[in-house]
Amino acid sequence: MKLKLGDIAKIQTGLFANNFADGDIVYLQAKHFNEEGLLKYALHPDLNSNEIEQRHLLKKGDVLFAAKGTRNFAAVYQNKKQACVASTSFFVIRLIEKNILPEYLAWYLNHPNTQQLLKNQAIGTSMVSISKVVLQNLEIHIPDLKTQKNILHVTELWKKEKQLKLQIETLREQQIQNQ
């Protein structure tokens, strides 16, 4: 089944805010994520909650989509320890359909074919960006939940395989150099 993202999720832009040295809410920015869309390091709260509306606070399972610049990626918000809001670099995608896993949606948005499709529709010259309308109209292929879980499982195994191959190569290099 294929559905438009705008029909299965609420999409809102991230928040523009000025950082403080100390705060009680984390202001998530694209620089906090590595190439695979994973958080790089522990985050420091740098926004004051008195100035943030509740609707901007991220909820577990929200999908963040970095829509500005040349590096577009999707990541699922999992942080349960600290309150966070997304910066304007992101669209926050909150699923309203229960038949799609947030992790599957992030995988789908990160898939090379989807990335190419989105890049072809990006606007701007010096700072390219993907518009909310483009995201809303993006057709998402939605298999059943079991298939979604299988896709995610195979993807995790593939990532582990890549990591193990890299470790093996590093150990080989070390062994050759130490002889």
Model-identified regions with their sequence ranges:
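ATP-grasp fold ATP-binding core
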Residues: 28
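Non-catalytic DNA-recognition/assembly elements of restriction-modification systems
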Residues: 1-17, 23, 137, 141-179
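A structural connector/turn signal
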Residues: 52-53, 80, 125
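Sequence-specific dsDNA recognition surfaces
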Residues: 4-17, 31-60
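Short, surface-exposed loop/turn microsegments at beta-strand edges and helix-strand junctions
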Residues: 19-25, 56-58, 76-88
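Basic, amphipathic alpha-helical recognition segments used for DNA target recognition
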Residues: 5, 91-142
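A short beta-sheet element
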Residues: 67-108
